[in-house]
Amino acid sequence: MTEQTTTPDGLVIVDKPSGFTSHDVVAKMRGIARTRRVGHAGTLDPMATGVLVLGVQRATKLLGHLALTEKEYLGTIRLGQDTVTDDAEGEITSSTDASGVTRASIDAGVAALTGRIMQVPSKVSAIKIDGKRSYARVRGGEEFEIPARPVTISSFRVYDVREAVAEDGTPVLDLVVSVVCSSGTYIRAIARDLGAGLGVGGHLTALRRTRVGPYGLDAARTLDQHQEELTVMPVAEAAASAFPRWDVDEKRAKLLLNGVRLDMPAHPPGPVAVFGPDGAFLVLVEEEKGKAKSLAVFA
Protein backbone atom coordinates (compact mmCIF):
# COMPACT_ATOMS: atom_id res chain seq x y z
CA MET A 1 0.00 0.00 0.00
CA THR A 2 1.12 3.55 -0.69
CA GLU A 3 -0.14 6.87 0.62
CA GLN A 4 -1.29 9.42 -1.95
CA THR A 5 -1.86 13.19 -1.87
CA THR A 6 -3.05 13.42 -5.50
CA THR A 7 -5.68 11.43 -7.40
CA PRO A 8 -4.72 7.76 -6.89
CA ASP A 9 -4.81 4.86 -9.31
CA GLY A 10 -5.52 1.56 -7.58
CA LEU A 11 -7.62 -0.20 -4.96
CA VAL A 12 -8.81 1.36 -1.73
CA ILE A 13 -9.91 -1.06 1.00
CA VAL A 14 -12.57 0.47 3.24
CA ASP A 15 -13.97 -0.75 6.56
CA LYS A 16 -17.56 0.28 5.85
CA PRO A 17 -19.52 1.68 8.78
CA SER A 18 -23.06 0.59 9.61
CA GLY A 19 -25.77 2.81 8.15
CA PHE A 20 -23.90 3.56 4.92
CA THR A 21 -24.92 2.06 1.59
CA SER A 22 -22.11 0.90 -0.67
CA HIS A 23 -22.98 3.83 -2.95
CA ASP A 24 -22.63 6.22 0.00
CA VAL A 25 -19.07 4.96 0.47
CA VAL A 26 -18.32 5.38 -3.25
CA ALA A 27 -19.69 8.95 -3.15
CA LYS A 28 -17.54 9.77 -0.13
CA MET A 29 -14.45 8.30 -1.79
CA ARG A 30 -15.03 10.38 -4.93
CA GLY A 31 -14.56 13.45 -2.77
CA ILE A 32 -11.54 12.06 -0.92
CA ALA A 33 -9.80 10.88 -4.11
CA ARG A 34 -10.86 13.93 -6.15
CA THR A 35 -12.25 11.87 -9.03
CA ARG A 36 -15.63 10.53 -10.11
CA ARG A 37 -14.00 7.37 -11.46
CA VAL A 38 -14.67 5.22 -8.39
CA GLY A 39 -16.58 1.93 -8.11
CA HIS A 40 -16.94 -0.98 -5.71
CA ALA A 41 -16.58 -4.76 -5.93
CA GLY A 42 -19.58 -6.34 -4.23
CA THR A 43 -22.40 -4.60 -2.38
CA LEU A 44 -22.67 -4.58 1.41
CA ASP A 45 -26.10 -3.96 2.95
CA PRO A 46 -26.43 -0.71 4.96
CA MET A 47 -26.66 -2.65 8.25
CA ALA A 48 -23.43 -4.54 7.54
CA THR A 49 -19.90 -3.38 8.29
CA GLY A 50 -16.49 -4.48 7.08
CA VAL A 51 -14.43 -4.91 3.95
CA LEU A 52 -15.59 -3.01 0.88
CA VAL A 53 -13.14 -2.97 -2.02
CA LEU A 54 -13.14 0.22 -4.08
CA GLY A 55 -11.43 0.81 -7.40
CA VAL A 56 -10.13 4.25 -8.33
CA GLN A 57 -9.22 5.34 -11.86
CA ARG A 58 -7.82 2.42 -13.92
CA ALA A 59 -8.47 -0.03 -11.08
CA THR A 60 -12.21 0.19 -11.75
CA LYS A 61 -11.52 -2.24 -14.62
CA LEU A 62 -10.54 -4.86 -12.02
CA LEU A 63 -13.73 -4.60 -9.99
CA GLY A 64 -16.01 -6.86 -11.99
CA HIS A 65 -13.46 -9.65 -11.70
CA LEU A 66 -12.71 -9.05 -8.01
CA ALA A 67 -16.44 -9.21 -7.27
CA LEU A 68 -16.43 -12.87 -8.28
CA THR A 69 -13.98 -13.90 -5.57
CA GLU A 70 -14.70 -15.68 -2.29
CA LYS A 71 -15.99 -13.69 0.69
CA GLU A 72 -15.90 -14.25 4.44
CA TYR A 73 -18.29 -12.96 7.11
CA LEU A 74 -18.95 -12.91 10.85
CA GLY A 75 -22.56 -12.47 11.89
CA THR A 76 -25.39 -13.08 14.31
CA ILE A 77 -28.51 -15.04 13.36
CA ARG A 78 -31.65 -14.79 15.49
CA LEU A 79 -33.80 -17.93 15.52
CA GLY A 80 -37.46 -17.41 16.41
CA GLN A 81 -38.43 -14.44 14.25
CA ASP A 82 -38.88 -13.77 10.53
CA THR A 83 -38.68 -10.28 9.04
CA VAL A 84 -39.71 -8.89 5.67
CA THR A 85 -36.07 -8.13 4.80
CA ASP A 86 -34.51 -11.24 6.41
CA ASP A 87 -32.50 -8.91 8.66
CA ALA A 88 -33.06 -6.61 11.63
CA GLU A 89 -33.88 -3.64 9.38
CA GLY A 90 -37.26 -5.07 8.38
CA GLU A 91 -40.61 -5.45 10.09
CA ILE A 92 -41.12 -8.69 12.04
CA THR A 93 -43.60 -10.91 10.21
CA SER A 94 -43.74 -13.89 12.60
CA SER A 95 -42.50 -14.92 16.05
CA THR A 96 -42.07 -18.49 17.32
CA ASP A 97 -40.70 -19.79 20.62
CA ALA A 98 -37.21 -21.09 19.73
CA SER A 99 -36.22 -22.23 23.23
CA GLY A 100 -36.78 -25.89 22.31
CA VAL A 101 -34.35 -25.86 19.39
CA THR A 102 -31.37 -28.08 20.24
CA ARG A 103 -27.72 -27.63 19.31
CA ALA A 104 -27.86 -30.93 17.43
CA SER A 105 -30.72 -29.69 15.25
CA ILE A 106 -28.89 -26.40 14.66
CA ASP A 107 -25.77 -28.30 13.56
CA ALA A 108 -27.87 -30.44 11.22
CA GLY A 109 -29.46 -27.33 9.73
CA VAL A 110 -26.06 -25.73 9.24
CA ALA A 111 -24.74 -28.88 7.55
CA ALA A 112 -27.69 -28.84 5.13
CA LEU A 113 -26.76 -25.30 4.11
CA THR A 114 -23.06 -26.05 3.58
CA GLY A 115 -21.49 -26.91 0.24
CA ARG A 116 -23.00 -26.36 -3.20
CA ILE A 117 -26.63 -25.37 -2.59
CA MET A 118 -29.52 -23.68 -4.37
CA GLN A 119 -30.41 -20.37 -2.73
CA VAL A 120 -33.33 -18.01 -3.26
CA PRO A 121 -32.01 -14.45 -2.75
CA SER A 122 -33.78 -12.19 -0.27
CA LYS A 123 -36.67 -10.33 -1.89
CA VAL A 124 -35.60 -6.97 -0.49
CA SER A 125 -32.37 -6.92 -2.49
CA ALA A 126 -30.82 -5.26 -5.53
CA ILE A 127 -31.18 -8.36 -7.70
CA LYS A 128 -33.06 -7.66 -10.95
CA ILE A 129 -36.19 -9.57 -11.92
CA ASP A 130 -37.17 -8.89 -15.55
CA GLY A 131 -35.12 -5.71 -15.49
CA LYS A 132 -36.56 -4.28 -12.26
CA ARG A 133 -34.89 -4.31 -8.84
CA SER A 134 -36.43 -6.82 -6.47
CA TYR A 135 -36.72 -4.29 -3.63
CA ALA A 136 -38.63 -1.92 -5.91
CA ARG A 137 -41.14 -4.68 -6.66
CA VAL A 138 -41.58 -5.31 -2.92
CA ARG A 139 -42.15 -1.60 -2.25
CA GLY A 140 -44.70 -1.55 -5.05
CA GLY A 141 -46.66 -4.35 -3.40
CA GLU A 142 -46.03 -6.81 -6.23
CA GLU A 143 -46.32 -10.57 -5.76
CA PHE A 144 -43.41 -12.36 -7.41
CA GLU A 145 -40.94 -15.19 -7.00
CA ILE A 146 -37.16 -15.10 -7.34
CA PRO A 147 -35.67 -18.23 -8.91
CA ALA A 148 -33.13 -20.17 -6.86
CA ARG A 149 -29.55 -20.05 -8.03
CA PRO A 150 -26.44 -22.08 -7.17
CA VAL A 151 -24.04 -20.75 -4.54
CA THR A 152 -21.19 -22.37 -2.64
CA ILE A 153 -20.93 -22.19 1.14
CA SER A 154 -17.37 -23.37 1.77
CA SER A 155 -17.65 -23.00 5.54
CA PHE A 156 -20.58 -22.32 7.91
CA ARG A 157 -19.72 -22.48 11.60
CA VAL A 158 -21.63 -21.71 14.80
CA TYR A 159 -19.37 -20.41 17.57
CA ASP A 160 -21.96 -19.63 20.22
CA VAL A 161 -25.67 -20.14 20.95
CA ARG A 162 -27.20 -17.58 23.30
CA GLU A 163 -30.67 -17.67 24.82
CA ALA A 164 -32.47 -14.32 24.64
CA VAL A 165 -35.91 -12.75 24.81
CA ALA A 166 -37.08 -10.58 21.91
CA GLU A 167 -38.77 -7.22 22.44
CA ASP A 168 -42.19 -8.84 21.97
CA GLY A 169 -41.39 -11.40 24.68
CA THR A 170 -40.62 -14.31 22.35
CA PRO A 171 -37.87 -16.69 23.58
CA VAL A 172 -35.24 -16.66 20.83
CA LEU A 173 -31.75 -18.01 20.18
CA ASP A 174 -28.92 -15.82 18.90
CA LEU A 175 -26.21 -17.69 16.98
CA VAL A 176 -22.75 -16.22 16.47
CA VAL A 177 -21.60 -17.58 13.11
CA SER A 178 -18.93 -17.35 10.43
CA VAL A 179 -19.53 -17.98 6.73
CA VAL A 180 -17.13 -18.37 3.82
CA CYS A 181 -19.01 -18.30 0.52
CA SER A 182 -18.99 -17.63 -3.19
CA SER A 183 -19.94 -14.36 -4.82
CA GLY A 184 -23.68 -13.78 -5.00
CA THR A 185 -24.48 -15.50 -1.71
CA TYR A 186 -26.96 -13.71 0.56
CA ILE A 187 -26.10 -14.16 4.25
CA ARG A 188 -29.60 -12.88 5.08
CA ALA A 189 -31.01 -15.74 3.04
CA ILE A 190 -28.85 -18.23 4.96
CA ALA A 191 -30.35 -16.91 8.22
CA ARG A 192 -33.86 -17.14 6.76
CA ASP A 193 -33.35 -20.67 5.45
CA LEU A 194 -31.75 -21.94 8.66
CA GLY A 195 -34.72 -20.65 10.66
CA ALA A 196 -37.21 -22.08 8.18
CA GLY A 197 -35.54 -25.48 8.28
CA LEU A 198 -35.77 -25.50 12.08
CA GLY A 199 -39.43 -24.47 11.96
CA VAL A 200 -39.02 -21.27 13.98
CA GLY A 201 -37.99 -18.64 11.45
CA GLY A 202 -34.78 -16.67 11.43
CA HIS A 203 -33.16 -13.42 10.41
CA LEU A 204 -29.78 -11.72 10.47
CA THR A 205 -29.17 -9.23 13.29
CA ALA A 206 -25.52 -8.32 12.67
CA LEU A 207 -23.02 -8.81 9.84
CA ARG A 208 -19.37 -7.94 9.34
CA ARG A 209 -17.50 -8.83 6.15
CA THR A 210 -13.98 -9.82 7.13
CA ARG A 211 -12.55 -10.68 3.71
CA VAL A 212 -13.07 -10.20 -0.03
CA GLY A 213 -10.73 -12.50 -1.94
CA PRO A 214 -7.23 -11.81 -0.56
CA TYR A 215 -8.19 -8.51 1.07
CA GLY A 216 -9.01 -8.69 4.79
CA LEU A 217 -9.74 -6.30 7.63
CA ASP A 218 -6.00 -5.94 8.26
CA ALA A 219 -5.78 -4.03 4.96
CA ALA A 220 -8.96 -1.98 5.51
CA ARG A 221 -9.20 1.55 6.89
CA THR A 222 -12.19 3.61 7.92
CA LEU A 223 -13.43 6.49 5.78
CA ASP A 224 -12.15 8.93 8.40
CA GLN A 225 -8.69 7.35 8.21
CA HIS A 226 -8.74 7.57 4.40
CA GLN A 227 -9.91 11.18 4.65
CA GLU A 228 -6.91 11.96 6.81
CA GLU A 229 -4.42 9.96 4.73
CA LEU A 230 -5.67 8.11 1.65
CA THR A 231 -4.07 4.68 1.33
CA VAL A 232 -4.05 3.06 -2.10
CA MET A 233 -2.96 -0.36 -3.34
CA PRO A 234 -1.37 0.12 -6.79
CA VAL A 235 -3.07 -1.69 -9.67
CA ALA A 236 -0.12 -4.04 -10.27
CA GLU A 237 0.06 -5.02 -6.60
CA ALA A 238 -3.70 -5.55 -6.49
CA ALA A 239 -3.65 -7.77 -9.58
CA ALA A 240 -0.70 -9.82 -8.31
CA SER A 241 -2.42 -10.46 -4.98
CA ALA A 242 -5.83 -11.30 -6.41
CA PHE A 243 -5.11 -13.36 -9.52
CA PRO A 244 -2.66 -16.03 -10.75
CA ARG A 245 0.39 -14.44 -12.37
CA TRP A 246 1.75 -15.07 -15.88
CA ASP A 247 5.11 -13.48 -16.71
CA VAL A 248 5.83 -13.06 -20.42
CA ASP A 249 8.76 -11.85 -22.52
CA GLU A 250 8.68 -8.67 -24.61
CA LYS A 251 7.52 -10.41 -27.78
CA ARG A 252 4.57 -12.12 -26.10
CA ALA A 253 3.73 -8.91 -24.25
CA LYS A 254 3.36 -6.99 -27.52
CA LEU A 255 1.26 -9.74 -29.08
CA LEU A 256 -1.08 -9.96 -26.09
CA LEU A 257 -1.50 -6.17 -25.97
CA ASN A 258 -2.48 -6.28 -29.65
CA GLY A 259 -5.19 -8.83 -28.92
CA VAL A 260 -3.39 -11.89 -30.28
CA ARG A 261 -4.65 -15.04 -28.56
CA LEU A 262 -1.53 -16.90 -27.49
CA ASP A 263 -1.34 -20.36 -25.98
CA MET A 264 -1.68 -20.15 -22.21
CA PRO A 265 0.17 -22.11 -19.54
CA ALA A 266 -1.97 -24.13 -17.15
CA HIS A 267 -3.77 -21.97 -14.58
CA PRO A 268 -6.86 -22.39 -12.40
CA PRO A 269 -10.11 -21.23 -14.06
CA GLY A 270 -10.68 -17.48 -13.97
CA PRO A 271 -8.73 -14.29 -14.70
CA VAL A 272 -4.93 -14.33 -14.95
CA ALA A 273 -2.74 -11.23 -14.53
CA VAL A 274 -0.07 -10.85 -17.22
CA PHE A 275 3.19 -9.08 -16.38
CA GLY A 276 5.89 -7.96 -18.81
CA PRO A 277 9.66 -8.51 -18.56
CA ASP A 278 10.04 -5.24 -16.61
CA GLY A 279 7.44 -6.35 -14.05
CA ALA A 280 4.73 -4.02 -15.35
CA PHE A 281 1.12 -5.23 -15.17
CA LEU A 282 -0.10 -5.40 -18.75
CA VAL A 283 -3.42 -7.14 -19.16
CA LEU A 284 -5.97 -9.38 -17.50
CA VAL A 285 -6.77 -12.50 -19.53
CA GLU A 286 -8.69 -15.74 -19.21
CA GLU A 287 -8.30 -19.08 -20.94
CA GLU A 288 -10.69 -19.85 -23.79
CA LYS A 289 -10.07 -23.05 -25.74
CA GLY A 290 -6.46 -23.05 -24.60
CA LYS A 291 -5.84 -19.48 -25.75
CA ALA A 292 -5.52 -16.20 -23.82
CA LYS A 293 -8.61 -14.03 -24.19
CA SER A 294 -8.12 -10.40 -23.14
CA LEU A 295 -10.46 -9.10 -20.41
CA ALA A 296 -8.96 -5.68 -19.68
CA VAL A 297 -5.79 -3.87 -20.79
CA PHE A 298 -3.77 -1.84 -18.27
CA ALA A 299 -0.56 -0.99 -20.15
Curated annotation (Swiss-Prot):
Q: Which Gene3D superfamilies match?
A: Pseudouridine synthase (3.30.2350.10), PUA domain (2.30.130.10)
Gene Ontology biological process terms, A to Z: mRNA pseudouridine synthesis; tRNA pseudouridine synthesis
Q: Which residues form the active site?
A: 45
Q: Report TM segments.
A: none
Q: InterPro entries annotated for this entry? A: PsdUridine_synth_cat_dom_sf, PsdUridine_synth_N, PUA-like_sf, PUA_sf, tRNA_psdUridine_synth_fam2_C, tRNA_psdUridine_synth_TruB, TruB_C
NCBIfam families in the record? TruB
Q: Specify the protein name.
A: tRNA pseudouridine synthase B
Its source organism is Streptomyces griseus subsp. griseus (strain JCM 4626 / CBS 651.72 / NBRC 13350 / KCC S-0626 / ISP 5235)
